[in-house]
């Protein structure tokens, strides 16, 4: 299946580390929404959305991209890294994919080093994440889909 993963990974590049590991072992197109993003996704069978978590949600830029360019009825999946414990991080992106009648086929998440907002005052949280094991788990998640 032809697959693209649209992503936003800033600050420490935690999410991009997972995607690079996936792309090293599988044929997948990585689309960075901050750099010349591809806008025609119709040729892809599956579309992943990957992001760090910002204020308990996927990046606004990624959500806006999905609203504008995600075709109707595609298979979608989510990959994300977060500093804080798991929460309702997928609500906003799921609203977009559900409105476009997409079929969700999976999600993978793990902690990522986070110095955003108040965590900076503490020297960050989740240092050393994603780990090699978490990265391997992301690759295994992708392979199983």
Where are these regions (language model features)?
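FMN-binding flavodoxin-like domain, especially the glycine-rich phosphate-binding loop
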Residues: 3-4, 10, 16, 23-31, ...
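Short amphipathic alpha-helix with an adjacent loop that forms part of the alpha/beta core around
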Residues: 37-43
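Catalytic beta/alpha-barrel core
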Residues: 34
């Amino acid at each position: 299946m032809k697959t693209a993963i649209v992503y936003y990974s800033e600050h420490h590049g935690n999410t991009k580390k997972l995607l690079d590991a996936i792309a090293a072992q599988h044929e997948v197109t990585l689309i960075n929404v901050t750099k010349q993003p591809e806008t025609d996704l119709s040729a892809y069978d599956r579309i992943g959305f990957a992001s760090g978590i910002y204020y308990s949600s996927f990046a606004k830029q990624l959500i806006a991209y999905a609203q504008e360019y995600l075709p109707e009825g595609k298979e979608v999946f989510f990959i994300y890294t977060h500093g804080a414990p798991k929460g309702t991080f997928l609500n906003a992106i799921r609203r977009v994919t559900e409105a476009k009648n997409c079929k969700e086929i999976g999600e993978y998440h793990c902690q990522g080093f986070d110095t955003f907002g108040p965590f900076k005052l503490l020297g960050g949280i989740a240092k050393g994440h994603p780990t090699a094991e978490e990265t391997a788990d992301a690759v295994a998640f992708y392979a199983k889909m």
